[in-house]
Structure formats: structure tokens, C-alpha cells
Curated annotation (Swiss-Prot):
The keyword Glycosyltransferase does not apply. It is a peripheral membrane protein. One of its GO terms (molecular function) is ceramide binding. Ceramide-binding protein that may transfer ceramides from the endoplasmic reticulum membrane to the cis-Golgi network membrane, and is thereby required for the biosynthesis of complex sphingolipids. One of its GO terms (cellular component) is nucleus. It comes from Aspergillus fumigatus (strain ATCC MYA-4609 / CBS 101355 / FGSC A1100 / Af293). GO terms for biological process: ER to Golgi ceramide transport; response to oxidative stress. This is Ceramide-binding protein svf1. The lineage of its organism: Eukaryota, Fungi, Dikarya, Ascomycota, Pezizomycotina.
Length: 396
């Protein structure tokens, strides 16, 4: 009967009943025995499930010249009946004096290669190399945003637990939904995006995330926090979501820290806290103004690992009203409940620390101010200057 209720809610877009926290098998349960699993080439396959889901491959760039960029392929299936694909690109204006360069374009004649490792469409190719260590993204889908980028993994990728997936449903053997994240937290980026005005050199560092929401997004999560932190030596990632009351408002947090070419820590014992917020009149949500992120766990050799980012976020980089800006197929999935209002608050900051572990703060428009990164491995403390991209998402 619970399966039937969930199916009806998925098809009709209605709010789900209260199943309770026992109806989500969090990936944190896997991580108790297997904190993380390094990705192989086969793990990078597109799933293309034949039921309601949204599958994304998202690439974040933090260029050496300070430019922050996101490019993304979205593959969506609605009720096993209709599939759609979209290509998004966004060049952020960190000064705040001009609009961001944001394009979201439908894809036509899209397909996967026979191994489900690469994706193509008219005027678009997202290709994984033979070694499984680099993606090339080439897009002429929009003449105002010509993309030619290569992301080369410089540290191992990982999923938390055995498969990076939390499962939803009252019968663990037959889940009716899922949520998966896989990370390449540290990449070398080469290439450009060319607009009508200029060509952006995007040489620098990046992160790649493969994500699958195997159910309607507003059924899986009501809140999200995402942190992407890059320094010359370290990368840290955190993806946290809180389920709706249907699943007990359960918090699931996956993330990790890498240094150069090795994973220092990855697991599910992390936290993200909005330590201060301000009411956003347009969205009617408490937009975060300060955040504290903590990574806690063990290194491969059994040392305690503790990392922390704590401080003000500075001026908001952007507020995206998803219902106003995303294509219709995403609205159909994310907004089929009357009153659903997803908002994504995006913040880009420069981060710096130096010497001993000292708290520093910076807003995105004031790079001389600093925010503190604290990293402790065993008895050793480390700190390093870098950059952060953060998102806070609210869905009701």
C-alpha cells in the first residue's frame, strides 16, 4: 500500500504521506562499514533509468584568472514516458556590475555511446577518454556560449559508501526512489568559453559531479547545501540534503577532502550549518549569510581528520528562481505540486588561511577580507589559500 501511495504521489505530483525516517536507507549506513569507494571507469556510466528521474553531469571551473563557471548536461525521464535533455552554461560575474552569462538550451537528437560513457546531441559532445581520466565538453548549442573544455582528474574520484546511493521506500529490497552522487573533487581544467563579447580562458582547477535523483526532487529533498573548495594543494566537497517530513526530515551528508593526488578523507560524517541568515523577501526563504562546514572522519592510515570552514558568506552571488529560469521538463518534475518554490542561492568566495589556524573572513566582492579553512590530520594542522563555490537550495 505504501508503494502504491508513493507511485500515485510520483505520477500526480502530490505530497507524499508520512513514512518516517525508517523509509530512507541513507548512504551513511553503507559508510559505517565502507566509508568510500574509489571510482572506476565503469562507475562513470550514464544510467538513463526508464522511470521518473533527473540525471546530471556538472562541471565547475575555478580558473586561475578568477573566473567561476558551471556547465551541465541534464538528462530527464518523466514517468518512463518522455525523455528530455538540456545543456546549461553559466559564467558568473563576481563584480556584480553586470548580469551573469547564463544559457539553458534544449538538446535534440541526443544519444549515448554504446558503453554509456559519453553523451552526444546536435552540436554537443561530452566525451570520456579511453583511460577514463578526462572529460571533454564541446558545445555549439548556443552561439553566445561556445564551450571547449577538458577536465582531467588529478586525484581519485569517489562515492561515499559502496555505491554513493541513498534509497527511499518502506521495503529496503524494493526501493521506490534513490539519490546518488559521485565526485571527481580535483581536476585540471583547460579550454575556453567564447561569447559574442570575448573568449574566456578557463585554465585552472575544477570539480565534476555525477548525480541522479531517482524520484521527484521535491519528494527526495527539501533543503540542500553544496560546498566546492579548491586550493593549490587541497580540494574539499560537501553535498548535504534534508528530506521532507515524509522521510523524517533526515539529513544526508556526503563529502571528502583530497590533497594533490590522494584522498585524505571521504565519508558521511560531515555537517553544514547556516549560522546566520537574512530573510529574502522575493523567495520568502532565510538566505544564509554565514555558514559552518565540518568534515570529520579517518584517513586511510587511521588518523583523525577534521576540517572546517566557518564564517560569513559575504554578498550573495546570485539567486536563481528555478521555476522561472529552468526549462519546462524540469518544472514538470520539480514543480508539479502547487506552491512548490525551489530557490538556489549561489555564493562564490575567496578563502585564505595562513600560518597557525586563525579565523579569517572574506566577502566575494572584497577579496582582501578572508575566510578561514582549518584542516587537522592527526596532530598536524594545515592551511592554504583557495576559493569556494557554495549553493544553498530551498524547496517547498
Amino acid at each position: 500500500m505504501n508503494w502504491l501511495k508513493s507511485t500515485l504521489a510520483s505520477v500526480a505530483g502530490t505530497q507524499e504521506p508520512i513514512y518516517g525516517p525508517e523509509a530512507i536507507q541513507s548512504v551513511a549506513q553503507q559508510a559505517q562499514q565502507t566509508p568510500y569507494t574509489e571510482l572506476t571507469k565503469d562507475d562513470l556510466r550514464w544510467r538513463a533509468y526508464q522511470y521518473t528521474n533527473v540525471e546530471t553531469e556538472t562541471f565547475y571551473v575555478m580558473a586561475d584568472n578568477g573566473t567561476v563557471v558551471m556547465v551541465q548536461v541534464i538528462y530527464s525521464n518523466i514517468a518512463g514516458i518522455h525523455t528530455t535533455a538540456q545543456f546549461n552554461s553559466k559564467i558568473f560575474n563576481l563584480k556584480g556590475d553586470q548580469p551573469h552569462i547564463w544559457h539553458s538550451d534544449p538538446l535534440y537528437n541526443f544519444m549515448f555511446d554504446e558503453n554509456m560513457l559519453s553523451f552526444g546531441a546536435d552540436n554537443l559532445a561530452l566525451t570520456l577518454n579511453e583511460e577514463g581520466t578526462a572529460y571533454t565538453i564541446k558545445s555549439a548549442v548556443n552561439e553566445d556560449s561556445l564551450v571547449n573544455l577538458t577536465f582531467t582528474r588529478t586525484a581519485p574520484g569517489f562515492v561515499v559508501g559502496k555505491d554513493g546511493t541513498s534509497y527511499f521506500g518502506t521495503d529496503p529490497a524494493n526501493p521506490w526512489g534513490s539519490m546518488m552522487h559521485a565526485f571527481w573533487p580535483r581536476c585540471r581544467v583547460e579550454g575556453t568559453i567564447t561569447t559574442k563579447e570575448k573568449t574566456y580562458d578557463l585554465t585552472g582547477r575544477g570539480m565534476f559531479i555525477h548525480a541522479i535523483q531517482g524520484m521527484k526532487p521535491h519528494h527526495a529533498a527539501a533543503r540542500w547545501n553544496f560546498i566546492n573548495f579548491q586550493t593549490p594543494s587541497y580540494s574539499a566537497v560537501m553535498m548535504e540534503y534534508t528530506t521532507p517530513p515524509s522521510y523524517g526530515s533526515t539529513v544526508v551528508n556526503v563529502g571528502g577532502i583530497v590533497k594533490d593526488d590522494e584522498i585524505i578523507y571521504a565519508g558521511a560524517t560531515n555537517s553544514a550549518t547556516h549560522t546566520a541568515s537574512a530573510h529574502d523577501a522575493d523567495s520568502d526563504w532565510p538566505a544564509p549569510t554565514s555558514i559552518k562546514c565540518v568534515w570529520d572522519g579517518k584517513s586511510k592510515d587511521g588518523k583523525d581528520v577534521h576540517a572546517e570552514l566557518d564564517g560569513p558568506l559575504g554578498n550573495r552571488l546570485d539567486r536563481v528562481d528555478v521555476m522561472a529560469e529552468v526549462p519546462g521538463f524540469v518544472k514538470t518534475i520539480a514543480g508539479s505540486v502547487a506552491g512548490t518554490r525551489p530557490y538556489i542561492f549561489q555564493v562564490s568566495l575567496s578563502l585564505a588561511t595562513g600560518g597557525s589556524v586563525v579565523k579569517l573572513t572574506i566577502g566575494q566582492y572584497s577579496p582582501q577580507e578572508k575566510l578561514s579553512l582549518k584542516l587537522k590530520i592527526g596532530a598536524e594542522e594545515f592551511s592554504e589559500e583557495g576559493s569556494m563555490f557554495s549553493e544553498a537550495t530551498f524547496i517547498s
